[in-house]
Amino acid sequence: MPLARNMPKNSSPLEKINTGNVKKLSLAWSFSTGVTEGHQAPPIVNNGYMYVTTPNAQVIALNAVTGEELWRYKKEIPADLLMLHNTNRGVALYGDKVYVGTVDSHLIALDAKTGKVVWDATVGDVKALSYITLAPLAAKGKILVGSSGGETGVRGYVAAFDANTGKEAWRTYTTAAPGEPGGDTWPAGDAYKNGGGSIWITGTYDPASNIAYWGTGNPAPWPTEGRPGDNLYTTSTIALDVDTGKIKGHHQYHYNDAWDWDEVSAPVLIDTNINGRKVKGAVHAGRNGYLWMLDRQPSGKLDFVNGISYVYNDVITSLDKTTGRPSYDMSKKPGMGKAVSFCPSLWGGKDWPPEAWNPKTKL
């Protein structure tokens, strides 16, 4: 299955297993990783190998037919660092290598056949509580990763590394500094330096435009009194040029977030027609409870098409018909010394699991 063609839709054209024969499936083999904590990484299969990651920084390669363990890599990480967020959401495959990010903020390239370390790059400063939980994204000779730590006062970023050497190619921050586009959406001072906007779910790559689309997390800290303004580029989808890391476009789903509504899920990329007009869509089911349709321009700009509430929402009262900017019921916005009830909760209408689109049924 060609990954580049199907990944942006999270769909598969395979039809051998269908509704008529799925009941005939039976267990072929099972395998225990030896880790009892919650696993969040899907198995990735290529050339007869199945790659699985576990919460404590392990990568396990199995024979996909028999379930036999072929090799296992484990990075030794101090227990206090594992307490940050002992989660790993998978690997990326590119060429003859397997790539994994770790909670001590390293990006590691392994030989896909042997599990031997090819290179090990330091991505962020774990002493500043920057860590990695997502699966890397492989695109055009680069491996892209992002920083978790929205609740620990990090400045979110996406960083790209050369797939062969591990040398850093570029780094793009998700909280705009003074003098940068969007810098005026933060207060004067250093609030942006600890402003959150973490990247903890893998982005989506469009090879036709060479743009990677990433969802960004909530601004930090949760109370908004110290960070008035829209706080770009938090709670947004950003469009990054894979060659340079430049932000080519963005759409912020809600501004000055006070509800912990990360919008980290990368959009599903679909080509469709709306009212007789062709739209290269980017669809995002938001944690804020709205389903968003954006139009991807060749320049990378993201234009608002529409937004529809798919769960009950008593915070957002309306959307601007042109920009999609929401209006709030301010009585539902929490603050220092102000307790409120609001819906959806901080877990959102949908948390981080991805959406999918079926090109045949258009669902």
Question: Where is each model-derived feature located?
Answer:
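Blade/loop signatures of beta-propeller domains
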Residues: M1-L27, T174-P181, P326-M330
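N-terminal cofactor/phosphate-binding cores enriched in small/glycine residues
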Residues: K9-V126
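Extracytoplasmic beta-rich repeat domains
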Residues: F31-I44, R72-A92, D120-A135, T152, ...
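Short coil/turn segments that connect the beta-strands within blades of beta-propeller domains
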Residues: N47-Y49, G95-D96, K140-K142, A208-N210, ...
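Residue position within the beta-strands of beta-propeller blades
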Residues: V52, V100, I143-G146, W214, ...
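A detector of repeated loop/turn-to-beta-strand junctions in beta-rich toroidal repeat architectures
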Residues: N56, D104, V154-Y157, L232-T234, ...
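Structural signal for beta-propeller blades
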Residues: V59-I60, L107, V158, G203, ...
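Beta-propeller blade signature
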Residues: L110, T114-G115, G156-K167, D230-K246, ...
